Amino acid sequence: MKKLLTTMTMLLALGQSAMAQFGSCTPSERYEYKDKQTGVTIIGLTDTTKNDRFMYQTDPMWTADGKYLLFRSSSRGDGKEQETVGRDGKKRKYRPTNYFFIDLETYKIIQATDGKEGGVFLGNKSNKFYYNRREEGKWNLYEMDLDSFFADVKTGKCKKQKHYERFIGTFPTEMGRPGGMAINSDDTYAFISVERDGTDEEKERMSKNAFIPESNQPIKIKPVLSGLRKMNLQTGEVTKIADVEFKVGHIQSSRFNPDEIVFCNETGGDAAQRMWYAKADGSVVKPLYKETPLDWVTHETFASRDYVYFNILGFQPRLRKQASGILRINLRNDDVELLGQVEMKADGDQLRGRGFWHCNASRDDKWSAGDTFAGSVWLINNETGMRYHIAAETKMKPDHSHPAFGPDCNTLIFQSGHFTNGKRLNLMMVDLDKVVK
């Protein structure tokens, strides 16, 4: 009988895990290990049986009060496999992505969506969670009250998701087709990138000015007429910021100034001019860091009040004829600084000499971090130039490491396929106070 009860208990636990849903709270998966190559102690936040990812490194991942850390996963929750049809008419199967929070006091994992959400973004001033849904062909934006939600989760009396959310507005179809979004620093507007139809004259100019890559570079993303819009988070009103004649990608908002936007010309590779800066009223739309033909600029991050950090790639022989690595540009005077590149002999054996791929920085501008083509994560002291090898063999599969800093400027996070040989990603955290003494 005792054996039977034990078996039933295990089956019940497995069933509850499989049917995890909105508001469910599961035990901590936290563990620690020491990287064999770097000697750094790394905290694992999720176990190796799931495939979890942080948000893209340009977006905030900590709640405004710093108590919860956001991530996404298609292997958690109870989302069943679904089928969709792409623009090319081809069918594909997928599991819905759900969004989760890690309670940084207990490391318990809380499911915060039910798989119907598209893009998401955390509030900067208050514990709000913004997300859009496609409902009856409409793009609708919602705001979720996280304080109320977390309080109910702790008591075990979580209500349905609609209880915590407020409908903000519907995006008008005549304003374009919404893509990415970012919430500004005072939580008053959502900045939204769009694709649009435009005029024949615009299309002709766009085709004429389209970037022509080197012969060994594929064209991954074709240019498309795009623009920037903003939605008032109180009224839902949508207004135009600007139109551009290239595909807008990686839209970002300053976490300090409510009217500053950074975005990119997204080609899936190199561009004649990748980085762009705009004011929310549309009065300024200009290139940010004017590129030379040998500059392959990528993965810009609006990390601090006055600086945008970015990479100039050096992964091809032709690109190594000038400086490459992590740089930053001062938004107030356009001054540019090269912060560092990894030593070629220390960049692993697999892709030696290819250097940094993605970058980020702490809000106080003291630290920058980058991942490399070889799968290492590095930390740079921007004041001294000192470099610290944090992690090796992240595999950069099934996604890149994408390092990012916490709001305390002493915490570094990244994702890694180290323990699964690149089959699944686990979420990692490093306490920088223990690395730099």
Task: List the predicted regions and their residue ranges.
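Blade/loop signatures of beta-propeller domains
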Residues: 21-43, 222-226
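Short, conserved, GDST-rich strand-edge loop motifs in beta-rich repeat architectures
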Residues: 22-25, 74-94, 142-146, 192-223, ...
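Multi-bladed beta-propeller domains
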Residues: 33-53, 100-117, 147-176, 231-247, ...
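Blade-loop segments of beta-propeller domains
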Residues: 51, 56-59, 76-134
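Conserved beta-propeller blade repeats
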Residues: 52-70, 114-134, 167-190, 195, ...
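Asp-box/WD-like beta-propeller blade repeats and closely related beta-sheet repeat scaffolds
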Residues: 114-226, 240-243
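Loop/turn-rich, solvent-exposed surfaces of beta-rich toroidal or solenoidal domains
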Residues: 307-327, 335-386
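Blade-level signature of beta-propeller repeat domains, shared across WD40, Kelch, NHL, RCC1
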Residues: 400-437
